[in-house]
């Protein structure tokens, strides 16, 4: 067991040298091909809770199928991200993978895109103005309230300009008119 651990630690040093980067879509299965075998390939996931985990003996948190050479990742999720290392005990050959999980791309059919573009062009080229029957009552009420508010503000400004000047005895001949 000590020789296996020493082999794994020595191999960790060379992980970045010969790694293959694999992008797997979320929810799919993927097979990692191991090195040529003389006995059996042992698969480990580097960087887990224990520095390395022998994953063919486990069922959680990742589900895999191991045969003598290959490792199949089942129903891939985000926890499958990481370095996978397969080595043959007898021949000291190894394969390592950097697994990255990607989100599936949502594709819109081209016919839908064309229909959406045509609809947008129709709306853009022929703007419709609502006739008097289609104008909602709330819109009329809002417009009336805004007009009334503006009128009140103007009246208040005129009253202030006229009466404030009279009370301060600074009458301006242009503002001096009787209401």
Swiss-Prot record:
Task: Report residues carrying sugar chains.
Answer: 29, 57, 70, 75, 123
Instruction: Sum up the protein's function in the record's words.
Output: E3 proteins seem to be dispensable for virus growth in tissue culture cells. They are potentially important for virus growth under special conditions; E3 region may help adenoviruses to evade the immune surveillance of the host.
In terms of InterPro entries, this protein maps to: Adeno_E3_CR1 (IPR003471), Adeno_E3_CR2 (IPR003470)
Q: Say which family it is in.
A: Belongs to the adenoviridae E3_20 family.
What Pfam families does the entry give?
Answer: Adeno_E3_CR1, Adeno_E3_CR2
The name on file for this protein is Early E3 20.1 kDa glycoprotein
Task: Name the UniProt key words of this record, in alphabetical order.
Answer: Early protein, Glycoprotein
UniProt keyword Glycoprotein present? yes
